[in-house]
């Protein structure tokens, strides 16, 4: 079986069924069903496992059948059925360690399927049965996430504060602090967030916890505080704290976005300086110093292109939709001859649509269709409308 020679395994299992004891025959029947599934006959395997469930009184055999049926259902992407089978299999399993493993699988699958009641119950069983300290700690953290998702903030806060005072949970104290930050965030207690994160990076340096805290600090400074230089410092610190952090690649992406944003702002200022110099040259006043001899490098990108880049970053990197819309409207109102004029209309419609403002989205689309009926953007919108109508 483990060498995947299922035909030979089936031949040997048939001998066990014919000549073995009733208990051995039942075990062999189970493995026959598994072999047939592994050979590609999933339905045959399902039928034989269900038949064995009907006939057997052995809790061990029945547990194995339920667990294998759960695995087959998962393979067939029938996750609700898989959850049901896992639950039944876990209840019948006698061995505590195995019970903990099964409930762990059940909890993870239920959580991913957003069946939070089942997931929480399963994680409680992981805590009760698992022999792994790490799995027990993770189960506690997952229960806290579920409480937050279900908006049971007071229960979550009480659980966190209780665990923080218990030496048994010292290993995950930093994770508990981070979960407390998430509670502050969802409850709008922004004043507490930065203080708590600064405490975390100080108390748990060079860890996955401090890496995540630096990432969250960077997000604070690209949203509420809007200080991109400070945010970049925090994002750049993430990989220094832990190169293994899941937040490291995201932090690098955000840091690059900040560089792009600051460079675009710098080029815009250069354009404005050139325009100001040109104005002074045409309309000098007695108080003006001479502009002769001043050498100014003209940026490669135009003002509309720079506005568009800023709009793109504001809306899609920093989630500041209003600022993104503001830059797009500047292009639309001030730069009608730019190639970024139709592109800005299209992007504006996209942002409004994603924000759920269908009236403004329709208005932006209609303006684009009227102004640039032969553009690729108009063609895309028209084809999209036709597909929607056909559906």
Q: For the regions a protein language model found, what residue spans apply to each?
A:
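Acidic, polar-rich low-complexity tracts and alpha-helical solenoid repeat scaffolds
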Residues: 1-391
């Amino acid at each position: 079986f483990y060498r995947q020679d299922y035909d030979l395994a089936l031949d040997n299992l048939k001998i066990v069924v014919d000549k073995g004891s009733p208990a051995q025959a039942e075990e062999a029947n189970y493995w026959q069903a598994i072999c047939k599934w592994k050979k590609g006959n999933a339905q045959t395997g399902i039928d034989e496992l269900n038949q064995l469930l009907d006939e057997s009184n052995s809790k061990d055999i029945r547990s194995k059948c339920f667990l294998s049926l759960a695995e087959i259902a998962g393979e067939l992407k029938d996750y609700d059925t898989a959850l049901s089978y896992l639950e039944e299999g876990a209840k019948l399993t006698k061995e505590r360690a195995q019970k903990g493993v099964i409930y762990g699988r059940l909890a993870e699958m239920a959580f991913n399927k957003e069946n939070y009641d089942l997931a929480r119950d399963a994680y409680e069983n992981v805590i009760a049965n698992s022999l792994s300290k790490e799995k027990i700690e993770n189960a506690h953290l997952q229960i806290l996430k579920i409480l937050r998702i279900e908006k049971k903030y007071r229960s979550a806060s009480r659980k966190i504060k209780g665990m923080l005072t218990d030496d048994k949970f010292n290993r995950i104290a930093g994770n508990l602090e981070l979960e407390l930050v998430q509670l502050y965030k969802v409850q709008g207690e922004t004043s507490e967030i930065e203080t708590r994160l600064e405490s975390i990076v100080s108390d748990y340096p060079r860890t996955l916890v401090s890496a995540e805290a630096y990432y969250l600090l960077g997000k604070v400074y690209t949203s509420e505080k809007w200080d991109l230089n400070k945010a970049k410092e925090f994002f750049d610190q993430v990989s220094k704290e832990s190169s293994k952090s899941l937040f490291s690649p995201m932090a690098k992406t955000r840091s690059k976005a900040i560089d792009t944003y600051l460079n675009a702002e710098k080029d815009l200022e250069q354009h404005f300086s050139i325009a100001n110099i040109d104005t002074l040259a045409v309309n000098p006043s007695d108080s003006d110093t001479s502009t002769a001899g001043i050498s100014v490098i003209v940026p490669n990108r135009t003002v509309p292109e720079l506005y568009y880049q800023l709009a793109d970053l504001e809306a899609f990197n920093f989630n500041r939709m209003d600022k993104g819309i503001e830059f797009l409207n500047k292009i639309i109102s001030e730069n009608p001859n730019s190639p970024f004029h139709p592109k800005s209309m299209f992007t504006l419609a996209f942002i409004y649509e994603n924000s759920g403002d269908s009236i403004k989205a329709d208005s932006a689309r209609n303006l684009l269709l009227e102004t640039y009926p032969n553009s690729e953007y108009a063609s895309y919108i028209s084809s999209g409308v036709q597909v929607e109508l056909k559906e």
